[in-house]
A protein has these predicted regions:
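Hydrophobic "anchor" residues on beta-strands that sit immediately upstream
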Residues: 6-8, 40, 79, 101, ...
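Histidine-centered catalytic micro-motifs
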Residues: 8-18, 42-47, 136-141, 210-212
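Metal-associated gating/positioning segment near the N- to mid-region
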Residues: 17-53
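Extended substrate/RNA-proximal surfaces in nucleic-acid metabolism proteins
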Residues: 51-176, 229-231, 251
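Charged catalytic cores and adjacent phosphate/nucleic-acid-binding surfaces used
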Residues: 1-11, 15, 25, 94-99, ...
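Short gly/pro/ser/thr-enriched loop/turn and capping motifs at secondary-structure boundaries
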Residues: 48, 110-111, 214-216
Length: 251
């Protein structure tokens, strides 16, 4: 049984750096403290459109989170990271080579969804792993929009299961995303619940992300706690509940 007090980390949050979120880094950190979290990952979208100033700002904000802000905030570990995008070219990747947490997900900004197939998405995730990404964000999202929305629920699930198989075989973290449930865009909640059952059978390691775009959402996982308990997902496979592993990875 997973309880709210068991969760000591939020591995997916956004701040005003993401341009469409509403809270600052400081507000998110304060919110994490209020929920008694010990770890918060700041994973603002990595836009990196090629502009020299923007490239510099993207890298600098990630490095500053870990090198400076983390040391100024006692009692909580601030993980400097970003939410990267499938199909995106990462500029100056050598400056990010020491980044421990490298999540990536499917977003419409860097791909043409209408002309993207399920196989294409699978191949993009595989390529992302080869490029050093060790966590896959919200794998249940966007599938209903691929290939002009022609895929059935069952076809989407088969594609998602292939991604899960790959993650299991290559020691990749899979995200259970709180906002996929409460937003439920195109049956994302149903796909998430379905793939979690399959991931449990495979013994996949997962992490919880609020995908907070407002500080009040940081560390708030009521829907995921309910779903994970219904499925009886093993607590030992959930990063957010594993203090020893979090310390090993981020301290």
């Amino acid at each position: 049984m997973i309880k709210e007090k068991d969760i000591i980390a939020d591995m997916h949050t956004h701040t005003t750096f993401s341009k469409h979120a509403f809270s600052s880094v400081k507000e998110n950190i304060n919110a994490a403290r209020e929920r008694k979290l010990k770890y918060i990952a700041i994973t603002d979208h990595y836009f990196g459109n090629g502009d020299d100033i923007e490239k510099k700002n993207e890298v600098n904000r990630i490095q500053y989170l870990g090198l400076r802000i983390n040391h100024m905030e006692p009692g909580i570990t601030v993980i400097g990271s970003a939410e990267f995008n499938l199909g995106q070219e990462i500029y100056t990747p050598e400056k990010l080579k020491d980044l421990v947490w490298r999540p990536i997900g499917l977003h419409s900004w860097f791909v043409d969804r209408d002309n993207l197939t399920i196989d294409d998405v699978y191949n993009l995730f595989v390529e992302a792993h080869y490029n050093g990404h060790n966590a896959f964000h919200h794998i249940e999202r966007e599938f209903h929009r691929l290939n002009h929305g022609l895929y059935s629920f069952e076809e989407c699930m088969e594609g998602i299961k292939r991604i899960i198989d790959y993650a299991h075989d290559n020691d990749i973290w899979l995200e259970a995303n709180e906002s996929s449930i409460f937003e439920n865009d195109g049956q994302s909640a149903e796909r998430l619940c379905e793939w979690l059952k399959y991931a449990k059978e495979k013994g996949c390691k997962i992490f919880l992300g609020s995908d907070a775009h407002y500080c009040g959402e940081v560390g708030y996982f009521p829907n995921l706690i309910r779903v994970l308990n219904e499925i009886e997902y093993p607590k030992e496979l959930i990063l957010n509940c594993n203090r020893e592993l979090l310390e090993k990875m981020f301290n």
